[in-house]
Amino acid sequence: KTVIVPAPGKIEIRQVETPVINAYQALVKTEMVALCNATDSKLIAGKFPGVDTYPLALGHENAGIVVAVGEKVRNFKVGNRAIGGLISDFGAQGVDSGWGGFSEYVVVNDFEVLKEEGLATPEQGCWDSFEIQNTVPSHVQPEEAVISCTWREVLGAFKDFNLTPGKKVIVVGSGPVGLSFVKLGKLFGLGQIDIVDMLPAKLEVARRMGADNGYTPAEISTPEFIAAANRSYDAVIDAVGLDVVVNSVLPLVKMGGDVCVYGVMTKNPTFDLSKAPYNFDLHMHQWPTRSEEKAAMTTLAQWIEEGRLSASDFITHRFAIEEIEEAFAAVKRGEVLKCVLTF
């Protein structure tokens, strides 16, 4: 079974054929999936850039157990827990792939072997996401494994954003991404981490994650706050993906600092340079850097083993996959930080 969006605004569970693996692939039986509040909601609404073919199979945050491997596979073994499994091609079943990770069985590709044999190219049907289809250590349980799909994307962006230990940052938005920047930033060794959100309850969650200060958008826009901040932030991070958010923090970034956008923006964002220092670096991170995302898992697994990072800090809702409509309704109502569904 798999979760299908038959047309924008609709969602259903449909029976499809179990994927047939090739020599470079492993078959994974899904244990748990997680909703990506932004991407999955946009795909359901028909508003994800570049995706306009329906029906499509939904989902890209997946964890499960390897149950079969192709003859050329070296980096997956039966019994391993794997993350990032997808279905890239549904063949003649009349379904397009919106990554297809919300499926009972998914496929992972042995990217390293594909690369060695010169097959890791788009012309050979290789997606960039194959690089981050990996196993996780045995101590990483299903909830941590599936939430790692979010964590590793965020931690993988630290290098792109020029974030180094000790830096002072302010993050706008306290959804799963914004809170991941806070939690992982503290574990990574960033200095002061402040957060901005409209809702006091979300600011309190951010403080529990390690944020030093929480502010509303109105508070950071006052002349008094801007004067007191005195352009002292090494980096400002937009964890929402809106130009109005970037403009709200441009007065806070230091000369030569980093303005970091994590999210998909509209076609023509407008930045008010009158609010910015003469020199700053703008980083647009609308797609993961796969090599950094993959490397981040080693650090995450260590933090999980040490008990310093737990999925329970992020998961607010748990459902069975048959309750997928209820899960998305909760997301739409704004109740969900992170939601997981079991198969």
Locations of the language-model features?
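Short N-terminal strand-loop motif that marks the start
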Residues: 1-58, 118-128
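Glycine-rich beta-strand-centered segment in the early N-terminal region that forms part
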Residues: 19-34, 47-94, 98-112
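Residue-level recognition of short, solvent-exposed, well-ordered loop/turn junctions
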Residues: 22, 77-80, 164, 254, ...
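NAD(P)H dinucleotide-binding glycine-rich loop of Rossmann-like/cofactor-binding domains
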Residues: 89-168, 172
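Mid-domain Rossmann-like dinucleotide-binding core that forms the NAD(H)/NADP(H) cofactor-binding site
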Residues: 138-219
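Glycine-rich cofactor phosphate-binding loops and adjacent beta1-alpha1 units
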Residues: 161-165, 209-283
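C-terminal substrate-binding/catalytic core of Rossmann-like NAD(P)-dependent dehydrogenases/reductases
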Residues: 226, 267-317, 325-326
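C-terminal capping/lid region of NAD(P)-dependent oxidoreductase domains
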Residues: 230, 260, 264-267, 309-314, ...
